[in-house]
Amino acid sequence: MVKVAYVQMNPQILEPDKNYSKAEKLIKEASKQGAQLVVLPELFDTGYNFETREEVFEIAQKIPEGETTTFLMDVARDTGVYIVAGTAEKDGDVLYNSAVVVGPRGFIGKYRKIHLFYREKFFFEPGDLGFRVFDLGFMKVGVMICFDWFFPESARTLALKGADVIAHPANLVMPYAPRAMPIRALENKVYTVTADRVGEERGLKFIGKSLIASPKAEVLSMASETEEEVGVAEIDLYLVRNKRINDLNDIFKDRREEYYFR
């Protein structure tokens, strides 16, 4: 059995040092509860509701050379956990809404958000790395960010690439994802870990309700709408590595791709 966790927090806009301190405390709390994988919200270090692209460019960092990735690697080394966390990435003059994956031995990889939501299109470029699955040794973790959930192809692609767990850093403002993510878990026979934020930022209110969902569409843990907190759940990887739903049906082998896009 493996334990996974979400960190639900209220990042302060353009205050990375304060956000590092808060995140470290909550990651350590999850680690004390036995979590081996901890997922943080989208843009956990920078805040979300930017006013200008220049504002984002000033605070965004390189991956993995930047301060945020270094901070996460240090915490992962100190706690022995694996971390998936959302951050603003600077690559030359280009900005991405990204997630980094780190572990006790350092940097593992990154994902760049493919489906940008609303005003994010003013600041970031769509991701160009594809949907990625990272092998942690004891399990495989796929990553998607916030609005990616709205497109079922996102979770399906990660599942087809072998993800046991889908890590889902988010800054949710619409109410639908907490209802939809158990279905994403069910239809792909994976676990999902959605780490949302709370609070209000420059007039934009976030819904909280971070959750862990099972391949049976069970909600194993759900956070409140307002509080900073950690949620931990034990998961059974056997359930996600067997894609059969009965003796005659396998959700991947029964796919009829030749009819899906006509």
From Swiss-Prot:
InterPro entries: Aliph_Amidase/BUP (IPR050345), Aliphatic_Nitrilase (IPR053613), C-N_Hydrolase (IPR003010), C-N_Hydrolase_sf (IPR036526)
Temperature dependence: Optimum temperature is 80 degrees Celsius. Active at a broad temperature range (60-90 degrees Celsius). Highly thermostable with a half-life of 25 hours at 70 degrees Celsius, 9 hours at 80 degrees Celsius, and 6 hours at 90 degrees Celsius. Shows a Tm of 112.7 degrees Celsius.
Activity regulation info: Enzymatic activity is inhibited in the presence of acetone, methanol and metal ions such as Ag(2+) and Hg(2+). Is also inhibited by various thiol reagents such as DTNB, p-chloromercuribenzoate, p-hydroxymercuribenzoate, iodacetamide and iodacetate. EDTA has no influence on activity.
Gene3D superfamilies (alphabetical): Carbon-nitrogen hydrolase
EC number(s) reported in the record: 3.5.5.1
Protein residues bound to substrate: 173-174
Active-site positions on this chain: 42 (proton acceptor), 113 (proton donor), 146 (nucleophile)
Ranges for domain CN hydrolase: 2-237
Molecular function in Gene Ontology: hydrolase activity, acting on carbon-nitrogen (but not peptide) bonds, in linear amides; nitrilase activity
pH profile: Optimum pH is 7.4. Active within the pH range of 4.5-8.5.
Pfam family, one: CN_hydrolase
Domain of life: Archaea
Subunit organization: Homodimer.
Function field: Nitrilase that hydrolyzes preferentially aliphatic nitriles like malononitrile and fumaronitrile in vitro. These dinitriles are converted to the corresponding monoacid mononitriles, showing the enzyme is regioselective. Cannot hydrolyze compounds with a nitrile group bound to an aromatic ring or amino acid. Its biological role is unknown.
Family: Belongs to the carbon-nitrogen hydrolase superfamily.
UniProt protein name: Nitrilase
Gene source species: Pyrococcus abyssi (strain GE5 / Orsay)
